[in-house]
Amino acid sequence: MSDTLKKYYYKKIVPKLIDQFKYKNIHQVPKLVKVTINRGLGEASQNAKALDSSIKEIATITGQKPVVTRAKKAIAGFKIRQGMPVGVMVTLRSQRMYEFIERLINLALPRIRDFRGINPKSFDGRGNYSLGVKEQLIFPEIEYDKIDQIRGMDISIITTAKTDEEGRALLKEMGMPFRSN
């Protein structure tokens, strides 16, 4: 399934970007490096059941078991001790990354309520894009009956692009539905 996006990238997107930005070498063309998906547990960090359900959901969505992130320092105001689980994250590369991006663009994003496109200003200045998802139900792999609570996640798409303009062009060619301002 994901081979299609990768093949499309090399056959169609690379020549377009070389034309658009006048690259002299094919290795200058921006490409996807990795996708990281992160979910902070918030007040659910005291609840072991919430941690387990988050691990299962992220694993179902990505096809890869997430890593549990732990608190570096104790914070009394949040009732967090050092070493307590505070979130889960997963890093996708190569095959799984392309599969996830394809599912995100074609299946998940169109299922968001009142969706008009994603914010084109969420680039970090170096061609990487981050977006927040408010609920996990937009992914077709998640069954409505099996979730205990609606939780969101952060998705970061890391590219080799040097500027936001290059990163935006790459993602737009891949089919990312940016909102027109």
Swiss-Prot record:
GO biological process: translation
Gene transcribed to yield this protein: rplE
Subunit structure: Part of the 50S ribosomal subunit; part of the 5S rRNA/L5/L18/L25 subcomplex. Contacts the 5S rRNA and the P site tRNA. Forms a bridge to the 30S subunit in the 70S ribosome.
Reported function: This is one of the proteins that bind and probably mediate the attachment of the 5S RNA into the large ribosomal subunit, where it forms part of the central protuberance. In the 70S ribosome it contacts protein S13 of the 30S subunit (bridge B1b), connecting the 2 subunits; this bridge is implicated in subunit movement. Contacts the P site tRNA; the 5S rRNA and some of its associated proteins might help stabilize positioning of ribosome-bound tRNAs.
PROSITE patterns noted in UniProt: RIBOSOMAL_L5 (PS00358)
GO molecular function, one term: tRNA binding
Record-stated family: Belongs to the universal ribosomal protein uL5 family.
Protein name listed in UniProt: Large ribosomal subunit protein uL5
Keywords: Ribonucleoprotein, Ribosomal protein, RNA-binding, rRNA-binding, tRNA-binding
Domain of life: Bacteria
Gene Ontology CC: ribonucleoprotein complex; ribosome
InterPro entries: Ribosomal_uL5 (IPR002132), Ribosomal_uL5_bac-type (IPR020930), Ribosomal_uL5_C (IPR031309), Ribosomal_uL5_CS (IPR020929), Ribosomal_uL5_dom_sf (IPR022803), Ribosomal_uL5_N (IPR031310)
Phylogenetic placement of the source organism: Bacteria, Bacillati, Cyanobacteriota, Cyanophyceae, Oscillatoriophycideae
HAMAP family: Ribosomal_uL5_B (MF_01333_B)
